[in-house]
């Protein structure tokens, strides 16, 4: 009888643990889906603006990845671009960057540390782009990404 109770207790404990694990996965999956919807919404906005729309201003022709993160006061966005885009950007638009050779890849950077740095992009394109998406501090890191902050939707 005691052995049966022990086995029954173990089975119930196992079921409870499985249920908890499944519930945790469901919450995680839902959160990821919410983030993806948000990201896709802004990715569509970015894709909708091309270099032909703003003649003379730079816009990536090929975007590798787009990320948004943050809440409350604002969001940090990163547009990852391929090597050809980086070369085109550095060759054609010197005013986008100063000395970024010492900067690591954005994948290794603490994003809070880049705000207010000396590689702020200040050309006319920023003003146009910022107005449309309420973006501040659009910057190029000189390696693989463009970083921007979005405030107050």
Residue ranges and their predicted role:
Residues 18-21:
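C-terminal motif of bacterial Sec signal peptides marking the signal peptidase cleavage site
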Residues 91-153:
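Extracytoplasmic electrostatic interaction patches
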Residues 31-46:
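Short aromatic-glycine motifs in intrinsically disordered, low-complexity regions
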């Amino acid at each position: 009888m005691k052995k049966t109770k022990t086995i029954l207790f173990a089975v119930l404990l196992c079921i409870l643990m499985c249920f908890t694990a499944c519930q945790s996965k469901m919450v995680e999956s839902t959160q990821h889906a919410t983030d993806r919807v948000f990201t896709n919404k802004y990715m569509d906005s970015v894709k909708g603006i091309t270099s032909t729309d703003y003649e003379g201003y730079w816009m990536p022709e090929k975007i590798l990845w787009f990320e948004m993160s943050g809440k409350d006061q604002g969001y940090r966005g990163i547009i990852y671009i391929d090597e050809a885009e980086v070369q085109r950007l550095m060759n054609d638009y010197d005013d986008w960057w100063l000395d970024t050779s010492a900067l690591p890849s954005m994948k290794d950077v603490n994003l809070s540390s880049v705000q207010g740095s000396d590689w702020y992009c200040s050309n006319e394109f920023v003003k146009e782009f910022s107005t449309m998406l309420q973006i501040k501090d659009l910057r190029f890191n000189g390696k693989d990404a463009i970083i921007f902050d979005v405030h107050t939707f």
